Amino acid sequence: MRLHHLLLVLLFLVLSAGSGFTQVVRNPQSCRWNMGVCIPISCPGNMRQIGTCFGPRVPCCRRW
């Protein structure tokens, strides 16, 4: 029975950890949460796009 509980806990940890990697930056709050900045033009040379802020035209940029 202890093994059953251990496997259940491991399954929960694997599923909960995987859900964080599938989230996409789509609004200003999640952009700031991911250490990004909303820039109304394309990202500068020292930054890369990690998502969008207000639709497809405003990128969320973060430093490399």
Swiss-Prot record:
Keyword vocabulary terms for this entry: Antibiotic, Antimicrobial, Defensin, Disulfide bond, Pyrrolidone carboxylic acid, Secreted, Signal
SUPFAM superfamilies under this entry? Defensin-like (SSF57392)
Q: In which tissues is it expressed?
A: Neutrophilic granules. Alveolar macrophages.
Modified-residue entries (Pyrrolidone carboxylic acid), positions: 23
Any one GO MF term held by the record is:
chemoattractant activity
- Please give the biological process terms from Gene Ontology that the record holds: cell chemotaxis; defense response to bacterium
Q: Which GO terms describe its cellular component?
A: extracellular space
Q: Where does it localize?
A: Secreted
Q: Signal peptide span per the entry?
A: 1-22
Transmembrane among the record's keywords?
A: no
Q: Which domain of life is it from?
A: Eukaryota
Provide the disulphide bond pattern: 31-60, 38-53, 43-61
Asked if the Swiss-Prot or TrEMBL record annotates the protein with the keyword Cytoplasm, the reply is no
Q: Which InterPro entries match?
A: Beta/alpha-defensin_C, Defensin_beta-like
What biological function has been recorded for the protein in this entry?
A: Has bactericidal activity. Active against E.coli ML35 but not against S.aureus 502A.
Tell me which family the UniProt entry assigns to this protein. Answer: Belongs to the beta-defensin family.
Q: Under what name is this protein listed?
A: Beta-defensin 5
* Protein source organism: Bos taurus
